[in-house]
Amino acid sequence: MKATIRNKLERMAERHEEIGAQLADPDVVGDPSKFAELSREYARLEPVVQDLNAYRAEADTVASAEAMLNDGDAEIRALAEQELAEAQRRLEELEGALQRHLVPTDPNDQRNIFLEVRAGAGGDEAALFAGDLLRMYMRYAERQGWKTEILSAREGEHGGYREVIARVSGRSVYARLKFESGAHRVQRVPATESQGRIHTSACTVAILPELDEVSAIEVNTADLRVDTFRSSGAGGQHVNTTDSAIRITHLPSGLVVECQDERSQNKNRAKAIALLQARLTEQERAKQQSERSEQRRLAVGSGDRSERIRTYNFPQGRVTDHRIGLTLYKLEQVMEGGMDELLDGLTQEHQAEALAEIAEDSG
């Protein structure tokens, strides 16, 4: 292990010990907010310390076994060789685990999300595919035990959606779905195609973290135009007889958001404001990223909505993620929410890219 990486890990272990002492301080115990904050940091560092202690123990075992290789007894040397091989294997595994601990965590990973699916090129077929994508994400959310709610929807003329926006809440939602932003392409024979020709259409997906009051961009009410309208029923579970649906226009940016999920106008307004803040924050993030031209793009993609990230080929039963070169002949399973193999591959690629940067920065 490189000395620079070892030093970073040692500092993390020292911080863990320091926090342990602070958590025993009566002044800290008497401050619930401070105690909770330190407890969370202590819990995050605990796996690092455990793996580092195990690494130290295995390093001692390796040194001991290497010393025994010079023993005059052939039987002892044979045992030492066996022990050395096993210890070196465990040491290598622990080194990998420790390096993964150094990968910076995304502060948004534990947040809920706004999922936006929009039909692109392809007309009616694109709208139908938008409906298929929404169903895929809903099924995946069910498997994860997450909660989903559709905030607004514009249905396609022949089914599906021209645009649909949902809120997904639960554990690690953003962490699992954050790489889904981008252009999704579908290749299949439409039901109305009499010649059996394959059509290509596309949808864009945007994954926006739902922000808390501290992280969200402050929205000046003077910059908003709020309109009310009667829910069409497409986005919610009912058809309103009152104008409870909300449309908010952010005048400086021109962004427009809607919510027609709730019967209460106030609840719809609160959800629409939260969605607007998420979009404004994402807009600012994208602007900053484009300005940092020297910043390396992740192998798994920049999250640009125009970037084609995945192709779903129905005649071949194939789904291909172009960012990591992964092809699965499990299209039906994926469309039913079996996305873990895709999502795991994207997460692993992201970690590998981050580890490569850590190694490079460590000289």
From Swiss-Prot:
InterPro entries on file: PCRF (IPR005139), Pep_chain_release_fac_I (IPR000352), Pep_chain_release_fac_I_sf (IPR045853), Prokaryotic/Mito_RF (IPR050057), RF-1 (IPR004373)
Where is it found, in Gene Ontology cellular component terms? cytoplasm
Bias category Basic and acidic residues: which stretches?
284-297
Spans annotated as Disordered: 284-306
Per UniProt, the keywords (alphabetical) are: Cytoplasm, Methylation, Protein biosynthesis
Q: Does the keyword Protein biosynthesis apply?
A: yes
Compartments, record wording: Cytoplasm
Q: Which residues carry this modification: N5-methylglutamine?
A: 237
Q: Which domain of life is it from?
A: Bacteria
PTM info: Methylated by PrmC. Methylation increases the termination efficiency of RF1.
Molecular function (GO) terms for this protein are: translation release factor activity, codon specific
Its function, per the record, reads: Peptide chain release factor 1 directs the termination of translation in response to the peptide chain termination codons UAG and UAA.
HAMAP family on file: Rel_fac_1
What PANTHER family does this protein's entry cite? LD18447P
Q: Which family does it belong to?
A: Belongs to the prokaryotic/mitochondrial release factor family.
Q: What is this protein called?
A: Peptide chain release factor 1
Which organism encodes this protein?
Halorhodospira halophila (strain DSM 244 / SL1) (Ectothiorhodospira halophila (strain DSM 244 / SL1))
Q: Which gene encodes it?
A: prfA
